[in-house]
Amino acid sequence: MDTSSLMEQILSSDNLNRAYLQVVRNKGAEGVDGMKYTELKEYLAKNGEIIKEQLRMRKYKPQPVRRVEIPKPDGGVRNLGVPTVTDRFIQQAIAQVLTPIYEEQFHEHSYGFRPNRCAQQAILTALDMMNEGNNWIVDIDLEKFFDTVNHDKLMTIIGRTIKDGDVISIVRKYLVSGIMIDDEYEDSIVGTPQGGNLSPLLANIMLNELDKEMEKRGLNFVRYVDDCIIMVGSEMSANRVMRNISRFIEEKLGLKVNMTKSKVDRPQGLKYLGFGFYFDSRAHQFKAKPHAKAVAKFKKRMKELTCRSWGVSNSYKVEKLNQLIRGWINYFEIGSMKTLCKELDARIRYRLRMCIWKQWKTPQNRIKNLMKLGVDKDIAWITAYTGSRIAYVCQRRVMNFAINKERLIQFGLVSMIDYYTKRCVTC
């Protein structure tokens, strides 16, 4: 494919219209100039032709990205760089033209930030490899990958494919556009900040070199952007692969391997893309399930949504719970979790009972509502006057009978086990 005149494809009306629609669809926060995505249309109407001419003449200067720190589950922070809306628009236009070119080069076992690919496909491929006897895992952790990409190495790799100097020029300008941290400017000497529309593609271009090296060595692997695992047949082979691939990453790609987090392990000790793995002795194969940390995160969020002191209606709590349940199961549906779903269902119902019991407030109101739900008057009276120990009351059999699964479903609650059973691909 001729890649010597790509700038005109990038600046074509059709490509720019698609880029605009995508940026507006993604919404997103303002960059350093404070412009909102809703203001982009008017801005481009006035300045679009000027921007196009600046890009053609290599005179366009991207603005610095705005640094935003996102807390990590492990206690650290992830640095995001938020470009201006205008720069997101231009980056999106570039990515739309470059992506089809690089899709022809990318490895079939690379799944992150690629069209029609997802984390679940990576997990299923990894399971296939494990069940073919490759049940020693090399889990390589790249230390602050997006913050440490070497610009010269990346541009050299891009230059092997892209021959349009105008495109090469603007991509490099985005890499060195700088960062604003609390109103202080900082040069971006290395890295491709997460948050830009080009960043995922540039990450895959860089790490495709790793994919090619692993393929050349005949290794079984899956990669989701910078999250890579290699499956081999023995512990000795796994340790050798860890040494050799780590050396390649550091010496050839100029990246840093975090040796304290990288490890050689069995599938049972692995956490990958939120999934854990176990060996099903009946089926004689490895299977996936939500990792314990993913379950703990779900429970924490569920507890927040069912907090009795949260001053919103119970119907609103159910609405938010349903969003959490659907999103979580949609992601983990390829995993085995029937028992887990039943346990979580029971926990959710228990916490909603406490919310409802508190909402009923007075003993008289509680007696009336329990009787409406079919509870005998004497039992309703005893239950209502048990005391203020809401957690204790809502564990009693009478409450399980009065506010049961069917009644909560009628109230609008999505049952995890029912939703999972409908969607599950492994049941």
Regions found by a protein language model. Name each.
Residues V176, K252-K320, L324-R326:
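A conserved non-catalytic segment of reverse transcriptases
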Residues N26-D33, P73, Y102-F106, N135-W136, ...:
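Short acidic (Asp/Glu) and glycine-rich catalytic loops that position anionic groups and cofactors
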Residues M1-A45, E49:
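Non-catalytic, polymerase-adjacent accessory regions of viral genome-replication enzymes
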Residues W360-C427:
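Extended C-terminal regions of large enzymes
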Residues E30, G34-P100, E104, F113:
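Active-site substrate-recognition loop segments, prototypically the cytochrome P450 B′-helix/B-C loop
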Residues Q54-E69, P73, E108-R117, Q121-K271:
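Conserved polymerase palm-domain catalytic core
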Residues K317-P363, I367, M371:
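Non-catalytic, peripheral interaction segments enriched in hydrophobic/basic residues
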Residues R88, Q92, Q96, P100, ...:
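Short, residue-level hotspots on alpha-helical faces of the histone-fold
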